[in-house]
Amino acid sequence: MAGAKEIKTKIASVQSTQKITKAMEMVATSKMRKTQDRMAASRPYSETIRNVISHVSKASIGYKHPFLVEREVKKIGILVISTDRGMCGGLNVNLFKTTLNQIKNWKEQNISTDLGLIGSKGISFFRSFGFNIKGQLSGLGDTPALEELIGVANTMFDAYRNGEIDAIYIAYNKFVNTMSQKPVVQQLVPLPESKDDHLNERQQTWDYLYEPEPKALLDSLLVRYLESQIYQAVVDNVASEQAARMVAMKAATDNAGNLINDLRLVYNKARQASITNELNEIVAGAAAI
């Protein structure tokens, strides 16, 4: 059994670590709530644009934007959104497994894949697999800005326009609640039909006067909408990261508390044994006299 002094030093070390994990838990909680506010603020914007796109695309008779046209799929581009930092449990690992499984399914259908990567964890992971990486971005921080994402987004959009890829998907961790984050791989381009499109079609009995013409407006709206979808996915992923980190740090704090209690018990036993030995020595010495 270790001496009482060594155990006391160990207790102090674990207490110091516990303070750090508790602080990280509180910081993650605060950041998660702020990110949830950004998520809520951005949703009405993208939903409104989607409704306008639905109406304008029906008004643009004789014109089909490339982002709305299905074509034979031979190669798919996936934009994978991961974190820049660790200590968030299995968040990134679960996303990477889901993405690789989807890539495997496409490969069985003779469909190849190119990647666009956001987040240093994803960059370091997928580089080792030898994928063709169209673009990458890291260092977004906790408050990502849309302007920072446009470069990677346009790289994927240009590849689609030029026929280098036939569809674009986005992989990220969808924030469900504090305790649950779901890795998803969903289609971005061609723009999948929304469930609300048919409802809007039945409800709208009026038409609009478009300035400029519907074609030019649709071109602009589609790019803005897709950029907003990527931004929404990044914000979702940040919220998932902070939630996962909060849970991981809480578990670490609780485990540290349990370890401290165990060490204190061992310390008390060691101290008691030391006192008992000293008493025995005193008694033995007195008996010898």
UniProtKB/Swiss-Prot annotation:
Belongs to the ATPase gamma chain family. HAMAP family: ATP_synth_gamma_bact. One of its GO terms (cellular component) is plasma membrane. It is a peripheral membrane protein. Produces ATP from ADP in the presence of a proton gradient across the membrane. The gamma chain is believed to be important in regulating ATPase activity and the flow of protons through the CF(0) complex. This is ATP synthase gamma chain. One of its GO terms (biological process) is proton motive force-driven plasma membrane ATP synthesis. The gene is atpG. InterPro entries: ATP_synth_F1_ATPase_gsu (IPR035968), ATP_synth_F1_gsu (IPR000131), ATP_synth_F1_gsu_CS (IPR023632). It comes from Haemophilus influenzae (strain PittEE). Pfam families: ATP-synt. Its main location: membrane.
